[in-house]
């Protein structure tokens, strides 16, 4: 099958509609949304988005809540580090 798009990639389906800057923004979101992520439980590159905020691993069948378009958000990273720091303070 021939390659259809060179620059536009996944947003080629929108054609010339909606403007270039909006298509670039949507392209970033759709690439992160459709890509596979590393599973925290089994370590394989098998975590895929099932629905908005629901991510499932194809390998170990774990289902976790995450971001709408990205598996791990910046807010989740901040909360995780704060919880880890509080846990370490409590133990010591």
Swiss-Prot record:
Q: Which Pfam families match?
A: Ribosomal_L37ae (PF01780)
Which GO molecular function, any one, fits this protein according to its record?
Answer: zinc ion binding
Zinc fingers (C4-type), renumbered ranges: 39-60
Q: Which GO terms describe its cellular component?
A: ribonucleoprotein complex; ribosome
Residue runs in coiled coils: none
Task: Tell me the leader sequence span.
Answer: none
Asked if the keyword Ribonucleoprotein belongs to this entry, the reply reads yes
Q: Which family does it belong to?
A: Belongs to the eukaryotic ribosomal protein eL43 family.
Full protein name:
Large ribosomal subunit protein eL43
Q: Which organism is it from?
A: Cryptochiton stelleri (Giant gumboot chiton)
Instruction: State the encoding gene.
Output: RPL37A
């Amino acid at each position: 099958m021939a390659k259809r798009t060179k620059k536009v990639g996944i947003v080629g389906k929108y054609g010339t509609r909606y403007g270039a800057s909006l298509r670039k923004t949507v392209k970033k979101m759709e690439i992160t949304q459709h890509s596979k992520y590393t599973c925290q439980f089994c370590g394989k590159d098998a975590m895929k988005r099932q629905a908005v905020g629901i991510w499932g691993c194809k390998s170990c069948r774990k289902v976790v809540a995450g971001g709408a378009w990205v598996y791990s958000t910046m807010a989740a990273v901040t909360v995780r580090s704060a919880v880890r720091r509080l846990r370490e303070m409590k133990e010591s």
